[in-house]
Amino acid sequence: MCSTPTYCDLGKAAKDVFNKGYGFGMVKIDLKTKSCSGVEFSTSGHAYTDTGKASGNLETKYKVCNYGLIFTQKWNTDNTLGTEISWENKLAEGLKLTVDTIFVPNTGKKSGKLKASYRRDCFSVGSKVDIDFSGPTIYGWAVLAFEGWLAGYQMSFDTAKSKLCQNNFALGYKAEDFQLHTHVNDGTEFGGSIYQRVNEKIETSINLAWTAGSNNTRFGIAAKYRLDCRTSLSAKVNNASLIGLGYTQSLRPGVKLTLSALVDGKNFNAGGHKVGLGFELEA
């Protein structure tokens, strides 16, 4: 069974071509490992080259497969602690229930979220409730699938203000090597994307967006080329003449290097260009 994507995953293939393989203006390192007892550890840290500010986070995950439970704990350098408990595929195939809590020791602030999603081969639905004593905010989404066509709706409702805060629609088509996605957010923001896998080595993507009542149209083209099983090149450009370049090299199994650069084509001689360096380690 091939589950229908969530609303946030609509057009994901096009987004990945634009976003993955880049890390402008920062030095970043990601590390993933797994203990003998099955506990997964993920940590990442990054430092911004323009401000020198550094931050990091640590995540541990433990799965109890017999009961469909996943326990996740998170911590970051802002001293925010998070705990997430998920229960998946036990009450029904494709059903996932999640409790997500956040605690900030410095301020004593506490918050939480209740999440539920149900995914099948022809539809997916989900909801989330932000727990707030002043009045929770309710989020919901649904996606229907039929012969490659996808139609989705996303909303959020602020119970404290009795106001609909988000009202989004999406329509798309998904084939094996081609994807088309369009969306309308709150009746004012319009956008679309096209993803095309030309062959086993080349992926391309086009992104277009504009806002009602504004002449500011955003347009971008991106491509990814796999030189071999270890090396890939990425490039993108938008109508603001910002040119992004990326190079990814698998140095050895579990070790990946990423180099990237952002060039301002309109002000090439003025400087202000950004470079990035990233390491991904997995053991």
Curated annotation (Swiss-Prot):
GO terms for cellular component: membrane; mitochondrial outer membrane; mitochondrion; pore complex; synaptic vesicle. The chain crosses the membrane at residues 26-35, 39-47, 54-64, 69-76, 80-89, 95-104, 111-120, 123-130, 137-145, 150-158, 163-175, 178-185, 189-198, 202-211, 218-227, 231-238, 242-251, 254-263, 273-282. It catalyses: chloride(in) = chloride(out); K(+)(in) = K(+)(out). There is a cross-link at residues 53, 109-110, 266 (Glycyl lysine isopeptide (Lys-Gly) (interchain with G-Cter in ubiquitin)). PROSITE patterns: EUKARYOTIC_PORIN (PS00558). NAD(+) binds at residues 242-244, 260-264. It is found in: Mitochondrion outer membrane; Membrane. The modification Phosphoserine is found at residue 241. Coiled coil: none annotated. Keywords: Acetylation, Ion transport, Isopeptide bond, Membrane, Mitochondrion, Mitochondrion outer membrane, NAD, Nucleotide-binding, Phosphoprotein, Porin, Transmembrane, Transmembrane beta strand, Transport, Ubl conjugation. Isoform 1 is widely expressed with strong expression in atrium and ascitic tumor, lower levels in brain and very low levels in liver and kidney. Isoform 2 is also widely expressed with highest levels in brain but no expression in kidney. Also expressed in flagella of epididymal sperm. The modification N6-acetyllysine is found at residues 12, 15, 20, 90, 266. The modification N-acetylcysteine is found at residue 2. Non-selective voltage-gated ion channel that mediates the transport of anions and cations through the mitochondrion outer membrane and plasma membrane. Forms a high-conducting channel with a stable open state and a voltage-induced closure with a mild preference for anions over cations. Involved in male fertility and sperm mitochondrial sheath formation. Interacts with ARMC12 in a TBC1D21-dependent manner. Interacts with MISFA. This is Non-selective voltage-gated ion channel VDAC3. The lineage of its organism: Eukaryota, Metazoa, Chordata, Craniata, Vertebrata.
